[in-house]
Amino acid sequence: MACRVAGNNNNPEQLWQSLLQKKDASGEIPEMRWEPYLRRDSRNAKILKETTSRGYFLDRLEDFDGQFFGISPKEAEQMDPQQRLSLEVTWEALENAGITARSLSGSDTAVFWGVNSDDYSKLVLEDLPNVEAWMGIGTAYCGVPNRISYHLNLMGPSTAVDAACASSLVAVHHGVQAIILGESKVAIVGGVNALCGPGLTRVLDKAGAVSSEGRCCSFDNDVKGYGRGEGAAAIVLKNLSAAIKDGDHIMAVIKGTAVAQDGKTNGIMAPNAKAQQLVAHNALKVGNIDPLTVGYVEAHATSTPLGDPTEVSAIAAVYGADREPEAPCFIGSIKPNIGHLEAGAGAMGFIKAVMAVQKGVLAPQANLTTLTKKIDWDNVGLKVVQQETKWPATDDVRRAAICSYGYGGTVSHAVIEQFNFPETLDLKPGASATNPTVLLLSGPQEKRLPIQARALRNWLQADGSQQDLQRVAATLAVRRDHHDYRAAIVVESKEDAIQALGHLADGANDAWTSQSRVFGSGINRDVVWVFSGHGAQWADMGKELLQNPIFYQAVQPLDEIVEAEIGLSPIALLRSGEFEASDHVQILTYIMQIGISAVLHSHGVYPQAIIGHSVGEIAASVVAGALTAEEGAVLITRRSVLYRQVMGQGGMILVNKPYAEVAQELAGREDLVVAIDSSPSSCVVAGSTEAVAEKAAEFKERSIKTFTVRTDIAFHSPMLNQLVDPLMQSLEGSLAPTTPTRAKLYSTSLRDPRGSDLRDATYWANNMVNPVHLTSAVQAALDDSYRVFLEVSSHPLVSHSINETIMDAGIEDYCMIPTLARKKPSEKSILHAVGQLHTRGANVDWKSQLSGPWAGGLPNTSWMHKPTWRQIGAGPVSTSQTHDVEKHTLLGQRIGVAGTDTVVYTTRLDNESKPFPGSHPLHGTEIVPAAGLVNTFVKATGATVLNNVVLRVPVAINAPRSVQIVAQREDVKIMSRLIQENEGNNDDSSWVTHTTARWESSSSSPVPAQIDVEATKARIGTRLRDEFSIDYLDKVGVSAMGFPWAVTEHYGNTKEMIARVDAAPSVAADAELPWDASSWAPILDAATSVGSTIFFNEPRLRMPAQIERVDIFTRANPPKVGWLYVQEASDTALASHVSVCDEAGNVVAKFTSMRFSEIEGTPGVSGSMESLVHQMAWPPAVPAEEPLPINKLLLISQDVPLREAYAATISSSTQVTLLANANDLIINRAESLLTKETAIVYIPSQVSSLQDVPKSAETFTWQLLELIKFVVNNALPVKIFVVTSNTGEGETPTALAHAPLVGLSRVIASEHPDQFGGLIDTEVLTFPLTTMRYIQGADIIRIRDGVARTMRLRSLPRHRLIQQQDQQQQQPQLLPRPDGTYLITGGLGALGLEVADFLVTQGARRVILISRRGLPPRRLWSKMEPSSPLAPTITKILDLEARGATIHVLPLDISQLTAADALTTALDTLSLPPVRGVVHAAGVLDNELVLDTTPDAFARVLAPKITGGLVLNEVFPPQSVDFFILFSSCGQLVGFTGQSSYGAGNSFLDALASHRQARGDRGARAFQWTAWRALGMGASTDFINAELASKGITDVTADEAFAAWRHAARYEGIDHAVVLRALPLDADEPLPSPALADIIVRRSASASADSSPSSSPEKQTIPTSGPELKAYLDKAIRGCVAAVLHLPAADEVDSKAALADLGVDSVMTVTLRQKLQQALRVKVPPTLTWSHPTVGHLVGWFAEKVGKE
């Protein structure tokens, strides 16, 4: 159990002491709780003063240890504190129960949690401007149990229970039921309550339920209501038999639970005594319990005048009846101590009852002065516990009942009883109170270890001083979770433990303490045991271990064998400590290693791989299962006897020089040889005594270090050849070797360390005379990914050599651990080694050595709390202080200037307060429309005339501004300055004047004559399309409107126009407008906009610059619908007069001589469309100064003639290997070829027909994927290239089949830039070796005209612009005609329906929607439920038909080859006018990383793109339709992460468009779209938007997308249009994609500086190499991670922790990449944080990249 409630009661034991002392934890609510409500509404202050502010509160509800659970501060602040509390108390409950979270992971464990407070939800979700995605699950009731299940990986039922105040006892009932019914083996139940807001308290005040004192006085005569309380309780339930079997500490047994409802009472909140009795009887019945045997009832007792007496009477009826006066049933309630926890109340009462039955003590009632007189206490058989009372001895078994009721009528009841579980100390053989043991501590972060150590030390000195140390060790090892940062402390006594823990707490390690972080998930933690050879002996070795029964039992049978063979007892030798003879040492080395191995096994440590060194190979073979221990004893004994023949004749020295060099130096000599290859820099030389001494002296003279090996035998030298035959004879029939069965066995006797030779007599003869290849064996283990080595020896002999070998391999994450060392306690040394293995993450079965009883009461995890609370916005600012956006002005707080006629209006302007409902961008920056400024002047002055309105500088909304409108006697002006400039700057120079005017309060001019609308229309004669104005403005770069007006009738020429305008087209004529009806801005915005279109013969992006005069002729509200009459002004070339009329033609307002200015930088007619629509250009590539060192080529192709044709053009100086397919490489590995100088080149085969394209494309893409997977997964140092020929033009079947490789290659290059060299498309069959070497960092390279070229996005070519003499009469080619039929694949998808809407809007009258799923028959449409997923689709189709179109839905899978015939037949059946346009928008998106792709998933994505495109191409051949639009994506152009299959399919569509254009199809066009906002498969989400931003681009709205379509329609002879916008970059920020190089805009250095961790005001110089570079990178990267996670400082980030464990989710990953890229100026691949999951890994990667650059 666990709990956390008011009064600093943070666990059940603290709570119990508080109960015994009758403490009342009530107090005032912390000030911060209600503070947001004081800011939210000025009326709240008075109300809050009247609201009960006292209760039972946690001192620091906001505190949470999110880092422990891997929850970032950003996510944590969006979580209800109830979720945070519940997570922590659940962890504490599991620790209290001795059940590890890891043991429950993946299990059917259930979680039921009482919760019914939504205070935090209201607090954060009502702060609408700051609502975020995580707040949904973060504030939901279900989020409490679901969060527990998620973080513990529990897969059983997980349910929130809301039964008001009965919730948590109902949760207990559900947990019991889940176990009884077999749904779950373990249930975690509980409840929580957090009081974050005043709302419900206010409700309860009104209902009279809450005491004004905010405290509970259960059973008291003066009860006035209850005090609300907060906190959480968690209880772990398990089947009794399972708990006994598992050795759990059973605190109590639940005998019965029941839940019911009290039916229709006097009121829904009124209690019902009968229902309370009934539920109690039901619980007793379940447990077959006599109520007279229940000694105590924990009552609900909320302290209400009605509730308490009702409940007591019900309890009396059940438990008090038939009681003897001297044996009453005791009752009490916990609420006066900790308050009424509402949803958590039942669980807290349950915990109190468990403590009572467990301890046999009844806690006294707090806050009880006089018992209520509404109960006849003398005759009810009940007694309130008023003093601490021992449980009556008359009870055989202590039983208690718990009541809990909800104000909605839920009644619940539980009956529990004590359980006595006899524990016995059953230590394993050989263990005793004085034997050493190991204490294990851990934490998710390193800084937790000292805190945990301090807590355990303090406990051992106090509450745990009487606990058995072995039990404490068992608890920590077996009953607690082991996190990534670990400490293992070997101790012999409690005093020893206290001292060692103190050292760790103070940051100093004890000699027997090991501390480390476990190796990351990408590092193999399996252990290689290394059995070293001769030379580890020391006096007294083994003496201590002989006292260990495990050691003794392992060596005693071997002792008998040796003694029978040679009359010598190894055990006796070990006890004597006298064994210098070489033959004795060999035998004892073997004996020790076998004994140590047995002790290690007893501690739960086993090898996964084994290396034997020299004589150590014998024990290694035994432990691996290749020999028996007895065979090993015979072998070592007989060989040692033979050694006596050569004793005293030889010697050995260790030489500090590589094996190969010394071997070359000694070549040809028999008296002196290299015997052991120890490490890359050392070896051992053996030979005759004289030769060794002579060579040692020579080495000394040459300053080469040598060390003498303690032996008089020249092991592993020709001197032992004479012993080979005798050895073979002596072993004949004595060995029966087998293949190793227990672990992988590496050989040091064979040239191939992985050799599988049987360990027979021949092997051991070779082992005796051949050199020892230790370096090779260790290197093989490293190559097989082993990183943990344990030397099994009496003293570390080869550890240094192995360390050298590992460091020479450049491996950083490894460990080399010895077992014993000279003159150190053996038992402690072995435990120390086991502890070191544990701290590195190696598997240790602690149950094998610490399986006995365990200790309860150990300190729980020490939380590292940090305040985590959402900062709530200030709420709505008074309209007296800021402008009202619905009035469309900038008039905020009005301030009169004393003594003058000046009035100043001040306000703040930002994106949240823009005074217009739409969007009004100018070159990407949102500005206030001119109409809004004029409206502001009119409303500020009350003027009817404005003269000389000068619009000087647009009012931009790209950053928050302080705005002032200054109105004087005749003048008015608008000024602003950026708010950040305002800080600390009182200088007027920062104010910008935007607009000025002179004003008159009344007009002397007469109202103009009424406009004769019909006569004007007749005079003009030319009817324009209703969309003329919008289309014209869109064409010149006005992509959106600030107001939603629409033209419904339009006549015009270059001299005059008249247009009927509806200012609010979506609002019915008699309905209320969605803005202030007095606002002139909407209709005036139409006037300024339509007024500019009179210059359509000279299309330019223009904006109003000056208006000579503005007249308002009416005091009435402006018309919703009216006429705009536009005339070309005669006084200037670019000015117009605009009259605003009502529907009758009466002039209500007029702009006289509105002059327009052309916007600087507008590039020709395309305007800002040029920043949206692009072409793919292929300028020459820039070669690198240093070529790639490619000297070997592996050409892989199944097309033999093609492969050989390319090979024939390669210089003979380059080694070329030809392979048929990737499997040849994967199977044969060709390791000698796979070096840094090697390039693997994939050459796809030629394809002869279009029918073969789909299957060939699948084959080619999958073969390339197999190659990249092989190279990446095996960490090969090679680069992969693809070579194609003339793919770019898409003219041939081969080009179409190869095209998917283009998109695939771009994504591969993005995800694996270090392994992928690029795709090179040649124009002739000449191998592009020079291009491969010199064109670096490019994903796709085309060689045309002999020049290597790379793709860049550029504006559409102006010479392709269709020159139109009459834009109203000539229909653009890519838009529909009323007489045609138009077909859309993917037609029922969101994107397809938007396309249909667009085509209908553009004039299409017949549309066919093709979709795999189709729709139900039309006769069923009217019966469709609104909730049906098809309802929106049907509604959309009916809407299109209501607009005059006919829509046909054709169910057809376009991805099937048979679809062509089916489509043709269907079109014939429909018998519609000819199809004039096709839009292929069908597709499937299956995002997977390159390494995770499967053939099936890839084929599923390719089919609708490739087969679907070819089907349409067959049915509608080139030139048979006006337009053939293919919906592609820009994802493959910029290498969108996870879109390898989607990118491949889309690049095929790009090629198909080129293929058709090459056949004269002018209407074939592929659109490479960016993400459509909220639409389609590429719909922009938080993740997509972050990924787009990381690529330097944005999404588009549907309106922008179709504007791009219309823009592209004006160009001919182009086969594609790339639709995206580039984001501006900092001055020195790396280019996200080379494709953007020509369209990107960079900020100036001063403008791009910010204060984020990724760019400080002072640009630091990045070190170029060494420790300084790594230190810099570590700090910078941790700073970026901290910024993403909203951590206060970089120091909060653990460099060794996985980013995912820190709380970095998929969206944050993209943001992190951006920050890293900006901070370190290095392009970051999308998969970097997946392949380099910690800051430490990232430091290594960036160090290499930064060093290169």
Swiss-Prot record:
Residues 1671-1746 form the Carrier domain. The active site is at C165 (for beta-ketoacyl synthase activity), H300 (for beta-ketoacyl synthase activity), H340 (for beta-ketoacyl synthase activity), H920 (proton acceptor), D1085 (proton donor). Residues 888-1165 form the PKS/mFAS DH domain. Residues 1021-1165 are annotated as: C-terminal hotdog fold. Multidomain protein; including a starter unit:ACP transacylase (SAT) that selects the starter unit; a ketosynthase (KS) that catalyzes repeated decarboxylative condensation to elongate the polyketide backbone; a malonyl-CoA:ACP transacylase (MAT) that selects and transfers the extender unit malonyl-CoA; a product template (PT) domain that controls the immediate cyclization regioselectivity of the reactive polyketide backbone; and an acyl-carrier protein (ACP) that serves as the tether of the growing and completed polyketide via its phosphopantetheinyl arm. This is 6-methylsalicylic acid synthase acuA. Pathway: Secondary metabolite biosynthesis. The gene is acuA. GO terms for cellular component: cytosol. GO terms for molecular function: 3-oxoacyl-[acyl-carrier-protein] synthase activity; 6-methylsalicylic acid synthase activity; fatty acid synthase activity; phosphopantetheine binding. Its EC number is 2.3.1.165. Residues 1-418 form the Ketosynthase family 3 (KS3) domain. SMART domains: PKS_AT, PKS_DH, PKS_KR, PKS_KS, PKS_PP, PKS_PP_betabranch. The modification O-(pantetheine 4'-phosphoryl)serine is found at S1706.
